[in-house]
Amino acid sequence: MDRKVVNATVALQDVWCGYDPAAPGGDMTVTRIGPHTLYCTDAYDLRPRLGYFDAEVMDPPYLFKASGGGAFRKSRDILDQIVEEGLDKGFDHTIINPLLCGAVFTFCHNDQLADLLPYLNGSFHRYAVCFWRKPNPLPMANKHYRADLEVYIHAWNRGFHPQGDLTDRMRMVESRSHRDRSLGHPTVKPDVVMDKIVRNAAGKTVIDPFMGTGSTGVAAIRAGRIFTGIEKNPKHFETAVRRIGAAYAGVN
């Protein structure tokens, strides 16, 4: 990857892109932007080798049926992209390791809660089920409830309980869905949502093993945290590098 994929306002001495045999994942693309490190590879292989982080923030693949939707479904290219990229197949919960993070924030589909909550409850000191409320949900229900709420779970070890003032500690955050397709990813989370999550996270270091186009990294950098991201899709990885490079330039 050429350094030019990073926003041009970032000083070149603060950016390194290429292969680093001395680092975990030496056989993959590694990009460093100041103190922040991005890996283009599979998270299940690399994440355990990266060690401990204060906060793990992730939007992993959901597990749901992408069929149905009636006449409206025919025009839903977002769902088609989700299926093409395998983002409807769920994820292996064991990538969340309570020995490798102080706390985890993970989005999930409603149908994943029955399996995910017992796993987190048995792994962490406490957890809370939180919600992102969308005032502009897709106009469909597909023999279910409308997707006006999206679930995320915050589970933490002792000492990594929710941070922020009383307003920050609300279990619900409201923001319109991100309908800007320019980022090329079907499930981009809004800045308002990610900023709130990072404010609730204790500690200094943040990792996102399913980085996508870098929304967690942007929020982490703006909050003064040190970010590490992993993304296996090269196209999304390049978008994340550009966005995180711009965020880093904006605070330096």
Residue map of PLM features:
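Class I S-adenosyl-L-methionine-dependent methyltransferase catalytic core
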Residues: 1-207, 211-252
